[in-house]
């Protein structure tokens, strides 16, 4: 117990750090957002009239920005995102770099597009290199997480170089266990709970707004928790200018991990404090699993990873014990892990919706002690071992990322 409660290296302090590192407010898909942030930071060091902006990124960042809506525009494209970030983005906005986008700047953005070049390289980890040229030259690098400005170089002079190994962040998360998470949520810190409350407010609001709109996937599905999840994701992917609380680098994961336990708890008239603990459980389980799969991967995080988190939370709300919560996670992962990520887009709404339905089903099964047996495929008896196997299987899917880019945007 003392290891959990005391000291800066205690499990409690580690969970706090993990939470605040992985739960942040954003406008729009986080990959165009990250590119936009690099541009906004670079602009602050630029002198004179802009000549060019060159951005080279890892292939997963590129994949996720091709077909997703840019906030406030309903339009697609990295060149547009870069131009808008240059015009209205501010470094202090962080992942909210697009929050000032409006129709009046669109025409100016189109005038800048000829000065913008975008390409990608076969890097497995999140890595964005943005070079801006005017009377001087500025280089900005983002690595490992969407708002980690790791390098700033102005006219060859290094202003910042804070390279942090992606393995350090992963190892920090891997140093805790699901049991540590279960213990923490029963006595969470107040500032953590306050962020959870914000996440509930923003993400449920997005779902409620989306489900009202004809043409939205959630509107078409009509009712039920999966429909609301689809509605929120579709709002975001379609380019609505709405704030979303991200989880482990993804707004869709934020919606898929926060909305289901919230609506389940409220439908069953549970106390808000209990719902907040459940949502925190969902967030932390999702973040924990993502430490093994990686931030950007060939695997659909909203459909298969966040749904494991929400199933844990729903099982908790329904009175499940620790073993049943773990079995719910295992049931989801053993069923949906093969769902791939073929880029951020409106169709993500349906993947998240399917994941949510499975989260509900997995919880029902776990509560009746009816679970996928170990040895069925990659399912292990211990969910922690299943998660470790997923880490290995994710790496085996890397060829998918290389091939799928050729199809995105082509009918």
UniProtKB/Swiss-Prot annotation:
<dbReference type="Pfam" id="PF03313">
    <property type="entry name" value="SDH_alpha"/>
</dbReference>
<dbReference type="GO" id="GO:0080146">
    <property type="term" value="F:L-cysteine desulfhydrase activity"/>
</dbReference>
<dbReference type="GO" id="GO:0019450">
    <property type="term" value="P:L-cysteine catabolic process to pyruvate"/>
</dbReference>
<protein>
    <recommendedName>
        <fullName>UPF0597 protein Fnod_1278</fullName>
    </recommendedName>
</protein>
<dbReference type="InterPro" id="IPR021144">
    <property type="entry name" value="UPF0597"/>
</dbReference>
<comment type="similarity">
    <text>Belongs to the UPF0597 family.</text>
</comment>
<dbReference type="InterPro" id="IPR005130">
    <property type="entry name" value="Ser_deHydtase-like_asu"/>
</dbReference>
């Amino acid at each position: 117990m003392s290891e959990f409660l005391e000291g800066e290296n205690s499990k409690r302090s580690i969970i706090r750090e993990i939470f605040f590192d992985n739960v942040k407010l954003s406008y729009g898909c986080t990959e165009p957002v990250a590119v936009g942030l690099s541009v906004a930071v670079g602009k602050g060091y630029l002198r004179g009239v802009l000549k060019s902006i060159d951005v080279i990124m890892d292939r997963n960042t590129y994949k996720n920005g091709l077909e997703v809506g840019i906030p406030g525009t309903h339009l697609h494209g990295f060149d547009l995102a870069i131009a808008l970030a240059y015009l209205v983005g501010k470094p202090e906005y962080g992942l909210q770099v697009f929050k000032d986008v409006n129709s009046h700047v669109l025409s100016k953005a189109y005038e800048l597009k000829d000065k913008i070049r975008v390409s990608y390289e076969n890097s497995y980890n999140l890595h964005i290199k943005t070079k801006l040229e005017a009377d001087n030259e500025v280089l900005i690098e983002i690595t490992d997480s969407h708002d980690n400005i790791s390098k700033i170089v102005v006219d060859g002079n290094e202003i910042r170089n804070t390279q942090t190994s992606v393995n350090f962040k992963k190892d920090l998360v891997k140093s805790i266990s699901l049991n540590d998470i279960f213990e923490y949520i029963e006595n969470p810190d107040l500032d953590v709970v306050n962020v959870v409350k914000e996440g509930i407010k923003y993400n449920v609001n997005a779902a409620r707004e989306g489900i009202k709109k004809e043409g939205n996937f959630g509107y078409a599905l009509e009712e039920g928790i999966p429909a609301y999840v689809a509605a929120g994701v579709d709002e975001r992917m379609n380019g609505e200018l709405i704030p979303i609380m991200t989880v482990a680098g993804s707004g869709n994961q934020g919606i898929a991990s926060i909305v289901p336990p919230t609506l389940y708890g409220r439908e069953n008239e549970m106390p808000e404090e209990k719902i907040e603990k459940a949502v925190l459980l969902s967030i932390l389980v999702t973040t924990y699993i993502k430490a093994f799969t990686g931030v950007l991967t060939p695997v659909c995080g909203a459909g298969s990873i966040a749904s494991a988190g929400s199933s844990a939370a729903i099982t908790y709300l329904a009175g499940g014990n620790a073993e049943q919560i773990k079995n719910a996670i295992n049931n989801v992962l053993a069923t949906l892990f093969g769902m791939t990520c073929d880029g951020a887009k409106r169709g993500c709404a349906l993947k998240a919706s399917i994941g949510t339905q499975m989260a509900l089903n997995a919880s029902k099964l776990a509560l009746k002690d009816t679970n996928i047996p170990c040895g069925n495929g990659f399912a292990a008896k211990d969910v922690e071992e299943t998660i470790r196997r997923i880490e290995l299987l994710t790496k085996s899917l890397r060829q998918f990322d290389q091939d799928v880019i050729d199809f995105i945007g082509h009918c």
